[in-house]
Amino acid sequence: MLKQVEIFTDGSCLGNPGPGGYGAILRYRGREKTFSAGYTRTTNNRMELMAAIVALEALKEHCEVILSTDSQYVRQGITQWIHNWKKRGWKTADKKPVKNVDLWQRLDAALGQHQIKWEWVKGHAGHPENERCDELARAAAMNPTLEDTGYQVEV
């Protein structure tokens, strides 16, 4: 039987683009581990993706995961859009390159071994774990120490 894990995630950006951060909580059998980091220049969507990626990459074996995010971009991207992006060679329906492709590919690789149920929660609506992730993400964004090397300025 697979281990059952809960993951809660959030991303934050002070300006968009601007300094940003992510926060994630991984819960297994009542124990929690938190993750957060801040980047000097990024976007909110990249930080939302990073939160999910980092938490999933921390799992050491196959797990059954319930992943809660307040990002429709992440949830819809991974449950609906990614299949066609991959078929089209990481292009959108109008043949443009997928934004944040580096992170979508990393997220796709991180989910390979897990059974994942994606849940959307309304942000800033009193969901305790989402609020904690938001606090982690905001604190990280206020003290950014990393460079988001995959971030590309849109022209």
Swiss-Prot record:
InterPro entries, A to Z: RNase_H, RNaseH-like_sf, RNaseH_domain, RNaseH_sf, RNaseHI
Biological process, per Gene Ontology: DNA replication, removal of RNA primer
Segments forming domain RNase H type-1: 1-142
Chief location of this protein within or outside the cell: cytoplasm
Signal peptide span: none
Listed result of changing residue 70 to N: Loss of activity
Binding site for Mg(2+) 1: 10, 48, 70
Phenotype when the gene is knocked out: In a strain that encodes a retron, the msDNA is abnormally sized.
Keyword set includes Nuclease: yes
Compartments in which it is found: Cytoplasm
Gene Ontology terms, MF aspect: endonuclease activity; magnesium ion binding; nucleic acid binding; RNA-DNA hybrid ribonuclease activity
Effect of residue 130 to A: Reduces activity
UniProtKB keywords: Cytoplasm, Endonuclease, Hydrolase, Magnesium, Metal-binding, Nuclease
Cellular component, GO annotation: cytoplasm
Family classification: Belongs to the RNase H family.
PANTHER family attached to this UniProt entry: RIBONUCLEASE H1
NCBIfam families for the chain: PRK00203.1
Protein's UniProt name: Ribonuclease HI
Gene (UniProt): rnhA
